[in-house]
Amino acid sequence: MTDIFEVPTPDNELLEKAKQLRLASIKTSQTNNDDRIRALNLMADYLEKNSKEIIEANIEDYKKAEIKGISKSLLSRLKLSKEKLNLGIEGVRQVGNLIDPVGQIQIKRELSKGLILERKTVPIGVLGVIFESRPDAVMQISSLAIRSGNGVMLKGGSEANLTNLAIVSALKEGLQDSNLDENAICLLTSRKDSMAMLNLEKYINLIIPRGSNELVKFIQENTEIPVLGHADGICHLYIDNEVNLDMALKVALDSKIQYPAACNAVETLLIHKDTASEFLNKAIPMFNSNDVKLIGDKKSFQLGVAFEANYEDWQTEYLDLILSIKIVNDLEEAIAHIQKFSSKHTDGIITENINNANKFMSEIDSSGVFHNCSTRFADGFRYGFGAEVGISTQTLPPRGPVGLEGLVTYKYFLRGEGHIVDDFSSGKLIYSHKDV
């Protein structure tokens, strides 16, 4: 089996798939808004028609994964319940209801009489998306790709191969029925192909890895294709001294236990020293009753946290029912801790002091900074994007949950009437630079 640290040369079969995908993406980029909406509705219809087969495939994948002994967090992401499938199908339809991201005029400017400049949004081209376990991501990513006029090459975790194949088969039926090229969605099933994808710079315009920090860094260092980075989700929640304790506990619980395998689940809880005793007195029994393993610094350990933390805990994304707890002297210490250990995904503060909230949100350089709400809101669907293709923790845009707006770029269109630069250099013509 190909090691993750090998980048093989694409074989002829993969090259042929990439060529077909590239051609299909060009065709998709030329479709109009109504065509793409119709395609999405039909893709959702065929997912519904094939839901029994999709669930059965997932049950088989899950059984095999259990036998292999994969982690609880991966098993949680792998499991596709009927409810989760229905939510995914509804998400496909909702993407169709979003404003068309293609062809939006961002600038329209008269440079001189008869010389008109436009900047318009256009599809990126072909997306290469590598992700782990979550089969519902196939629906999200594919719908966003088609809605934005792109093609997409998908590589999910091998533990979800049967589920992913069943989902992609249904999506392709929808594309066929809508008269769009079914090759606009391409699924790879081997690790060798996923690594060889990194050498497809002639065919792929953007790679979006959704996996471990190790995987993301490796991809960034081993491809000439631009990478939209989504590394670890080491999210923090700071409980201030001016706080409604009941609200703080409710938000902290939701941030950890609502879906602990998610990248936006909180991993470290920071508590002001003046609040710590009263908060932990209420929080420890609640976390214990929800099977959360609490790991704390010496101060929180002395206040009843069961296990003592080490340095590694502050930089660990557990993706499980485990929570690190640290007691801090003040807001400044909380900010310093987050600046040191945060993966720049999502960090939040619980406080009644608006000045403290504003200071926290201004100084924390994460893609999402939250005040008095759960970190679990850091999600494209919850932001109203319809769905997300990934979350970017980089500083340059797109940043945070990436929906449709992150899957288009722009081109400059300049239309003239035989204009030449020399006429402007000589003074025969002048620039008007007037927005129209």
UniProtKB/Swiss-Prot annotation:
In the record, the note on similarity to other proteins reads: Belongs to the gamma-glutamyl phosphate reductase family.
Q: Please explain the role this protein plays, according to its UniProt record.
A: Catalyzes the NADPH-dependent reduction of L-glutamate 5-phosphate into L-glutamate 5-semialdehyde and phosphate. The product spontaneously undergoes cyclization to form 1-pyrroline-5-carboxylate.
Question: SUPFAM superfamilies this protein is in?
Answer: ALDH-like
Q: Can the keyword Metal-binding be found in this entry's annotation? A: no
Where is it localised? Answer: Cytoplasm
Q: What is its EC number?
A: 1.2.1.41
Q: What is this protein called?
A: Gamma-glutamyl phosphate reductase
Quickly give the catalysed reaction.
Answer: L-glutamate 5-semialdehyde + phosphate + NADP(+) = L-glutamyl 5-phosphate + NADPH + H(+)
Q: Which PANTHER family match?
A: DELTA-1-PYRROLINE-5-CARBOXYLATE SYNTHASE, GLUTAMATE SEMIALDEHYDE DEHYDROGENASE
Tell me the route in metabolism or biology where this protein functions. Amino-acid biosynthesis; L-proline biosynthesis; L-glutamate 5-semialdehyde from L-glutamate: step 2/2
Entry GO terms, CC: cytoplasm
What's in the keyword line of the UniProt record?
A: Amino-acid biosynthesis, Cytoplasm, NADP, Oxidoreductase, Proline biosynthesis
Recorded hits in Pfam families, A to Z, give: Aldedh
Gene Ontology MF annotations: glutamate-5-semialdehyde dehydrogenase activity; NADP binding
| UniProt GO BP | L-proline biosynthetic process
Q: Does the keyword Calcium apply?
A: no
Q: Which domain of life is it from?
A: Bacteria
